Amino acid sequence: MLITTSEKLYGVEYETLDVVFGVTTHSKNIVKNIGAGLKNLVGGEIKAYTEMQQEARKIAMDRLKEEAKNIGADAIIAMRFDSGSISNDMQSVVAYGTAVKFKNQ
């Protein structure tokens, strides 16, 4: 499935189906939270949280694609991510975009 951050697809006719979403919320275990807290004292990248964010984005994208597939979409345009903290150790990620179906295929 084609997924793009572009607002439009050029050179192809399509119809808009609906807005689609993929959502997930993740947290790390207490051991990784303690490690992150210690890293916060000395500075630098907190790899446990970077990995958590990457995994959450992948899951959100997979869910986005699945929702688009379920409504018969051929592509998703104007795809975006949004994320936010629910608490100190929980992160929510949303992938969203516009599901479209190609005409004359």
Swiss-Prot record:
Keywords: Plasmid. InterPro entries: UPF0145_dom_sf, UPF0145_YbjQ-like. SUPFAM superfamilies: YbjQ-like. Pfam families: YbjQ_1. Disulfide bonds: none annotated. HAMAP family: UPF0145. Belongs to the UPF0145 family. This is UPF0145 protein. It comes from Enterococcus faecalis.
